[in-house]
């Protein structure tokens, strides 16, 4: 199964960071022109993935403005849930990205309204885990509102390590128009950030989805039960422990529904 997953994710065992940056910027430019959209929108958390995707987006629109004389724009959106504990990291990311526009929308009131509506309708309280997914979906809703208003595309940060584990919210951070980090694993993303001269604090920041109130700042690796180094090694075709391989492959099968459009009677992938 390892070779099948490597083929699906498109991860290369070795990359040229400079060349990968060029190719991914070119992809953003070509698709933006193809669609006729006026720019790009991306949520910025202060983590590795959005920092990298954000910088690629800004480079892409700057190059397009120079090449086409059209006013393409990039909107970087801060989407905190109330007061974000690592706000300084988010500000550091914005300083690195240098976006055309930096917007801020606090999603806490909208999430609270959604929770209240659910409780009123059902008489039940949504679990903390499900509330975390509601936060992710509210963030994406806001990004699509902004994109619709300005005639832009929404950029996602999904990469190979997230894809194989399904470590994203369906119709939340998994919903977007284009994913410039596809085909990269976690350590390769770091390589691109170093090539772009990102602050070391952004590159080495402990990854966290930070969605659960009861477990704030829960590290991804703790939630996954495996390390990104193990996942990256697997995706590069290396041997990892039998236990970790079995866990990763079982997880890949379990989250298969996230890799497809809504299932229909004509589909057979799930059988």
Swiss-Prot record:
Please list the residues that bind ATP: 43-50, 157, 186, 208
Residues that hold deamido-NAD(+) according to the record: 137, 170, 177, 257-258
Any GO CC annotation of this UniProt entry: cytoplasm
Question: Which species expresses this protein natively?
Answer: Exiguobacterium sibiricum (strain DSM 17290 / CCUG 55495 / CIP 109462 / JCM 13490 / 255-15)
- Where does the chain bind Mg(2+)? 49, 162
Entry's Pfam families?
NAD_synthase (PF02540)
Under the heading CDD domains, the entry gives: NAD_synthase
Catalytic activity, as annotated = deamido-NAD(+) + NH4(+) + ATP = AMP + diphosphate + NAD(+) + H(+)
Keywords from the UniProt entry: ATP-binding, Ligase, Magnesium, Metal-binding, NAD, Nucleotide-binding
Its recorded name reads NH(3)-dependent NAD(+) synthetase
Which Gene Ontology biological process is one annotated for this entry? NAD biosynthetic process
Known pathway:
Cofactor biosynthesis; NAD(+) biosynthesis; NAD(+) from deamido-NAD(+) (ammonia route): step 1/1
EC number, as in UniProt: 6.3.1.5
Specify the superkingdom.
Bacteria
Q: Tell me the subunit arrangement.
A: Homodimer.
Asked if the record carries the keyword Transcription regulation, the reply is no
Q: Does the keyword ATP-binding apply?
A: yes
EC class of the enzyme, as a word: ligase
Gene3D superfamilies, alphabetically? HUPs
Free-text function comment from the UniProt entry: Catalyzes the ATP-dependent amidation of deamido-NAD to form NAD. Uses ammonia as a nitrogen source.
Q: Which GO terms describe its molecular function?
A: ATP binding; glutaminase activity; metal ion binding; NAD+ synthase (glutamine-hydrolyzing) activity; NAD+ synthase activity
What protein family does this chain belong to?
A: Belongs to the NAD synthetase family.
């Amino acid at each position: 199964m390892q070779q099948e997953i490597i083929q699906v994710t498109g991860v290369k065992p070795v990359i040229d960071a400079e060349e990968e940056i060029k190719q991914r910027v070119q992809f953003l430019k070509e698709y933006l022109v193809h669609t006729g959209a006026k720019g790009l929108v991306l949520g910025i958390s202060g983590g590795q993935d959005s920092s990298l995707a954000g910088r690629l987006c800004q480079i892409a629109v700057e190059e397009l403005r120079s090449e086409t004389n059209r006013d393409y724009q990039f909107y970087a959106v801060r989407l905190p849930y109330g007061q974000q504990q690592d706000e300084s990291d988010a500000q550091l990311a914005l300083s690195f990205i240098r976006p055309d526009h930096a917007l801020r929308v606090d999603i806490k009131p909208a999430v609270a309204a959604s929770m209240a509506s659910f409780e009123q309708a059902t008489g039940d309280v949504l679990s903390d885990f499900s509330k975390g997914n509601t936060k992710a979906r509210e963030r994406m809703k806001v990004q699509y509102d902004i994109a619709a208003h300005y005639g832009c595309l929404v950029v996602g940060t999904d990469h190979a390590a997230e894809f194989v584990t399904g470590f994203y919210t369906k119709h939340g951070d998994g919903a977007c128009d284009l994913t410039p980090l596809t085909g990269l694993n976690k350590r390769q993303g770091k390589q691109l950030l170093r090539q772009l001269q990102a602050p070391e604090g952004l590159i080495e920041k402990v990854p966290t989805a930070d969605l659960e109130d009861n477990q704030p700042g829960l590290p991804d690796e703790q939630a996954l039960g495996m390390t990104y180094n193990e996942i990256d090694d697997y995706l590069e075709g290396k041997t990892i422990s039998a236990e970790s391989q079995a866990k990763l492959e079982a997880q890949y099968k379990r989250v298969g529904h996230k890799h497809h459009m809504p299932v229909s009677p004509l589909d057979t992938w799930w059988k």
